């Protein structure tokens, strides 16, 4: 008697459902980033409360249209305070947006319909209104640090309504 072949699971191929952040290969780790670039916005911390405030000011290396770093391989050398996410940091950083795939996976949640690993299309993150495309006013080199408070916005910490849908709108 031969064993029946294992029925493929709907989870097969969805590495983020079967692995912890620590188990991801470097390629899987990088592919988990949805390309929203919200983490590339300048943030301010209230010294008294520790609360983090987002601005619509991008890092000096952020290409706001592409929602990508202009020098990703050398970003830490060129921007010393650039945060290189690790599984530990994903679990500890309170400012990661609610849509962050690293945070979702760390919390045992699934990715949204617009994530490129689900949709197969890197543009759905923009279509869903999750990315910073069209919302970055300037870069940090154009705004004096003293004026960053004038550029505080709330949208990076929120999830747009159409991004919360269970599937891509028609």
Swiss-Prot record:
<comment type="similarity">
    <text>Belongs to the UPF0260 family.</text>
</comment>
<dbReference type="InterPro" id="IPR005358">
    <property type="entry name" value="Puta_zinc/iron-chelating_dom"/>
</dbReference>
<dbReference type="Pfam" id="PF03692">
    <property type="entry name" value="CxxCxxCC"/>
</dbReference>
<protein>
    <recommendedName>
        <fullName>UPF0260 protein Rpal_2074</fullName>
    </recommendedName>
</protein>
<dbReference type="InterPro" id="IPR008228">
    <property type="entry name" value="UCP006173"/>
</dbReference>
């Amino acid at each position: 008697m031969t064993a029946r072949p294992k029925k493929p699971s709907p989870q097969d191929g969805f590495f983020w459902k079967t692995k912890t952040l620590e188990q991801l290969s470097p390629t899987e780790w990088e592919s988990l980033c949805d390309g929203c670039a919200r983490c590339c916005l300048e943030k301010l911390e209230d010294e008294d409360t520790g609360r983090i405030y987002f601005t619509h000011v991008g890092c000096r290396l952020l290409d706001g249209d592409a929602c990508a770093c202009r020098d990703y391989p050398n970003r830490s050398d060129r921007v010393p305070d650039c945060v290189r996410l690790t599984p530990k940091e994903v679990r500890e950083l309170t400012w990661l947006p609610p849509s962050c795939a690293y945070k979702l996976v760390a919390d045992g949640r699934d990715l949204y319909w617009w994530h490129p690993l689900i949709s197969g299309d890197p543009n759905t993150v923009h279509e869903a209104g999750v990315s910073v495309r069209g919302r970055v006013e300037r870069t940090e080199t154009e705004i004096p640090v003293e004026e960053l408070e004038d550029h505080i916005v709330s949208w990076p910490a929120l999830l747009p309504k159409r991004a919360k849908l269970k599937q891509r709108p028609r």
